[in-house]
Regions:
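Inter-helical junctions in multi-pass inner-membrane proteins, predominant
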Residues: 1-12, 155-163, 192-232, 252-269
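Membrane-interfacial amphipathic/re-entrant helices at transmembrane-helix boundaries
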Residues: 1-16, 44, 57-59, 85-90, ...
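Transmembrane helix-bundle core of multi-pass membrane transporters
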Residues: 90-161, 260-271, 296-302
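Helix-loop-helix "hairpin" substructures at the membrane interface of multi-pass membrane proteins
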Residues: 133-214, 218, 237-243
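Short loop segments and helix-boundary regions at transmembrane helix junctions
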Residues: 26-30, 69-117, 161-163, 219-234, ...
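Short, non-helical or kinked segments that cap or interrupt transmembrane helices
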Residues: 22-42, 56, 86-90, 164-167, ...
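Single transmembrane alpha-helix segments in multi-pass membrane proteins
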Residues: 1-50, 77-87, 91, 229-237
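Cytosolic-side transmembrane-helix boundaries in multi-pass membrane proteins
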Residues: 173-180, 184-187, 258-302
Length: 302
């Protein structure tokens, strides 16, 4: 049960850190609204369940697309105008914080409206009762793992087997040179925000099967998302995935171990664990684990 929960949580953190890294690589903006976009996806799944009786697993493609559209709106209406005006990274970062607060306020109002209309709980909810089991193993383990594998396969195919993917990679590695070569860098940025927010929506739909969701959940989980991305190397897609699993598993296992020693009150401080892992990794490998391992391997092979 513990290992099952750790794997599920790691799958979701890996999906979220992957999305965060994609937008950082293409626009150099750390998106502080990423966690709240995921929770918005959770609430979209809840709306589809309450009003249209669509099971959350069936709702995945719908939420995926809707959250992707939210990402396009965030970039097109807020970030692109600022980038065109030559805004610094700090200003863009503050803009994502503002987006986070706007989304958070909207989610709070949305949860009030859902409760008033349906008389069902929306301020706090969980999807565990809608899950299935196979041989005593929760369905969320299979679904989250299958989702992660599917995303990795599709992303690999997109980046390495399509013309648009090659253009996207070129824009990620050197936007100025890509633009000189005639690549529409703006289009790749819009797509990256769509993809990033879609991944957040996917993770957000699955998250209520793992834990209770409240409007502020995104503000808590963003700590783990950023820790995973930075630990792996903020500009590395492979690092984001590796960091997601490292942070997810260590946070789950360490929280469980500490709760056995100090009691359940320690759960209030669970986010100290990913932050501690982040500090340790940055002290040993400032550029992230993936780049750090490459340097160590190169050093010992001399």
């Amino acid at each position: 049960m513990l290992l099952e929960g750790a794997i599920v949580y790691s799958n979701l953190i890996a999906l979220l850190s992957l999305g965060l890294t994609i937008t950082y690589i293409t626009t150099s903006v750390p998106n502080f609204a990423h966690g709240t976009i995921a929770v918005f996806g959770s609430y979209l799944a809840l709306i589809l369940l309450y009003f249209l009786n669509i099971h959350p697993y069936i709702a995945i493609p719908i939420v995926f697309l809707l959250c992707g559209l939210i990402g396009i709106l965030c970039y097109s209406l807020v970030l692109r105008p600022l980038i065109k005006r030559g805004a610094s990274v700090v200003i863009l970062m503050i803009a994502t914080l503002a987006l986070d607060l706007i989304l958070l306020g909207f989610i709070g109002s949305l949860s009030d409206a859902i409760e008033e209309i349906t008389s069902k709980s929306a301020k706090k909810f969980i999807f565990a009762i809608y899950d299935f089991e196979i041989s005593g193993i929760s369905g969320i383990l299979f679904v989250s793992t299958a989702s992660m594998i599917s995303i990795l396969v599709l992303l690999w195919f997109l980046l390495f087997k399509t013309k648009f993917g090659i253009a996207l990679r070129a824009s990620m590695e050197n936007p100025a040179l890509a633009e000189v070569m005639g690549i529409d860098v703006e289009k790749t940025r819009i797509f990256s925000w769509f993809l990033s927010s879609s991944l957040a929506g996917l993770a957000g739909t699955l998250l209520p099967f793992k834990q209770e969701i409240v409007p502020l959940t995104g503000s808590l989980i963003i700590v783990s998302i950023f820790s995973a991305s930075i630990v792996g190397g903020l500009a590395s897609i492979a690092g984001a995935i590796f960091g997601g699993y490292l942070i997810g598993i260590s946070e789950s296992l360490a929280t469980y171990g500490l709760s056995m020693i100090f009691g359940s009150e320690i759960l209030l401080y669970s986010k100290v664990i990913p932050l501690t892992a982040l500090v340790i990794v940055l002290l040993l490998m400032p550029q992230g684990i993936v780049e750090g391992l490459r340097k160590w391997i190169k050093f010992f092979s001399i």
